[in-house]
């Protein structure tokens, strides 16, 4: 009797194991438990997600599993199989077509090319259209840097969107911005990030909830190339790591949640991207990348200090024209230094390091 019970139990375990393996056939085991949890959270929409996993081609199954395993709960309950299958298909198509995309590590591709979203924007099927729109700008590019340059230089004229405070909302999706022909810095950054991703260039949105001198938030775009991240913006500054906000970013405060700099992630990181338009949203993962900007800016200052073409400048603001040089008569004021229309520096005059 005992021997028979052991046989029955053994057969049951084998059947259970077979069912589990068949359920996630072709998907790495590291995703299985995560997918189980995701499908429970999905509720009635689990059938759509299961269909997406089942119908994804073998070479795209890990990508589909990655998206479903790590997507926020709102997406688990709403996204359709067709939406996910199209997004994944065109992401892998770009990876197969472009030489730089084929060289991207899997971890970078999954987290910074494959995702259909950057922040909390409306979920849209932008990838197919953007693959076609921006493919023409990179078809003759031989390196990822050439491709980045080409997309960045042409994105504005391709989508006909400009910065405008009259836009409907700050966190617009690509098509919402294109319909209005206007967007916030966040909307522009999402547009550019999606344009890069559509042609196999890893990209993410970066930004700060508040500049070091209390001037408010700003968001921009980062791109990955040859093992490193670089920053740029919708209005191409001419070269990477050289946008108008560089000086401000260089003064960010890592341990101040409101004045640190964050870069978006699809996979959870233990940190969230602070969204100033809805501070209750905590489901957008992020990395605190403040050190990258402050270290880069420090190196930049050391370089220009040694080149013989720059001189130190000290500016103080006073309460009246008596200009008494003591701390009681100094006042705090924001200081912006321009060269034409470009902001070279932006610091508070009361900053002891300015």
Predicted stretch roles:
Residues 164-166, 198, 209-214, 219, ...:
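His-Asp-centered catalytic microenvironments across diverse enzyme cores
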Residues 151, 181-206, 221:
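Cysteine-centered nucleophilic/redox motifs
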Residues 1-9:
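Bacterial N-terminal signal peptides that target proteins for export
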Residues 23-60:
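Non-catalytic protein-protein interaction scaffold segments in large eukaryotic complex-forming proteins
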Residues 50-51, 56-180, 269:
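Secondary-structure boundary elements
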Residues 144-147, 198-204, 226-228:
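Loop/turn elements at helix/coil->beta-strand transitions in domains of secreted/extracellular proteins
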Residues 17-18:
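C-terminal motif of bacterial Sec signal peptides marking the signal peptidase cleavage site
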Residues 10-14:
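Hydrophobic helical h-region of N-terminal Sec-dependent signal peptides
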């Amino acid at each position: 009797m005992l021997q028979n019970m052991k046989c029955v139990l053994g057969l049951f375990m084998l059947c259970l194991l077979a069912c589990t393996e068949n359920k996630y056939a072709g998907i790495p085991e590291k995703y299985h438990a995560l997918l189980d949890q995701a499908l429970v959270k999905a509720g009635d929409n689990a059938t759509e997600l299961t269909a997406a996993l089942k119908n994804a081609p073998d070479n795209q199954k890990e990508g589909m599993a990655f998206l479903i395993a790590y997507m926020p709960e709102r997406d688990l309950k709403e996204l359709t199989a067709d939406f996910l299958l199209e997004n994944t298909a065109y992401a892998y198509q770009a990876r197969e077509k472009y030489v730089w995309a084929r060289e991207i590590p899997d971890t970078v591709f999954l987290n910074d090319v494959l995702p259909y979203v950057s922040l909390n924007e409306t979920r849209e099927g932008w990838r197919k259209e953007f693959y076609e729109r921006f493919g023409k700008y990179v078809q003759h590019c031989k390196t990822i840097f050439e491709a980045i340059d080409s997309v960045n230089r042409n994105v504005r004229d391709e989508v006909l969107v400009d910065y405008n405070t009259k836009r409907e909302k700050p966190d617009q999706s690509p098509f919402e911005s294109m319909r209005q022909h206007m967007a916030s810095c966040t909307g522009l950054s999402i547009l550019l990030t999606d344009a890069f991703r559509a042609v196999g260039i890893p990209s993410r949105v970066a930004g700060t909830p508040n500049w070091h001198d209390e001037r408010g938030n700003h968001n921009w775009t980062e791109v990955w190339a040859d093992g490193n991240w670089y920053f740029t913006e919708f209005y191409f500054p001419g070269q990477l790591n050289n946008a108008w906000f560089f000086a401000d970013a260089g003064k960010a405060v890592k341990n101040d949640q409101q004045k640190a700099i964050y870069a978006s992630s699809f996979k959870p990181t233990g940190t969230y991207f602070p969204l100033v338009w809805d501070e209750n949203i905590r489901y957008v993962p992020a990395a605190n990348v403040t050190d990258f900007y402050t270290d880069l800016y420090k190196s930049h200052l050391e370089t220009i200090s040694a080149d013989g073409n720059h001189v130190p400048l000290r500016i103080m603001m006073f309460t009246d024209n008596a200009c008494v040089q003591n701390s009681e008569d100094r006042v705090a004021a924001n200081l912006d230094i321009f060269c034409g229309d470009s902001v070279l520096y932006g610091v508070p005059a009361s900053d002891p390091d300015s």
